[in-house]
């Protein structure tokens, strides 16, 4: 897939998520991020989730790590910013 197309799809997904959160979530609220990332990229995820309560779990084959981060956020914009920062990490999957 063309990187420009991928970026457009991601921007649209985050825009829709923000709309849903603004309509359904009362802020401040605790939010849980979950990402799966290759072991070689885990340090990048930890930087994005810095300051959160973090949990890491390695996959059974040891190639991937599931990283969760939990924190209280004051707005949907703060949450979307985390997703945007994470989206540039090679091989990341947001759950």
What are these regions (language model features)?
Residues 1-64, 74-95:
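Long, contiguous binding/interaction regions
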Residues 65-69:
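Short, hydrophobic beta-strand segments
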């Amino acid at each position: 897939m063309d990187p420009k197309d991928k970026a457009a799809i991601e921007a649209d997904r985050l825009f829709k998520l923000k709309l849903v959160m603004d309509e359904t979530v009362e802020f401040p609220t605790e939010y849980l991020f979950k990402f799966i990332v290759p072991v070689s990229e885990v340090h990048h995820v930890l930087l994005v989730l810095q300051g959160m309560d973090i949990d890491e779990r390695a996959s059974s084959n040891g190639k991937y790590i599931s990283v969760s981060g939990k924190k209280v956020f004051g707005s949907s914009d703060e949450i979307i910013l985390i997703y945007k920062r994470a989206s540039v990490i090679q091989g990341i999957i947001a759950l």
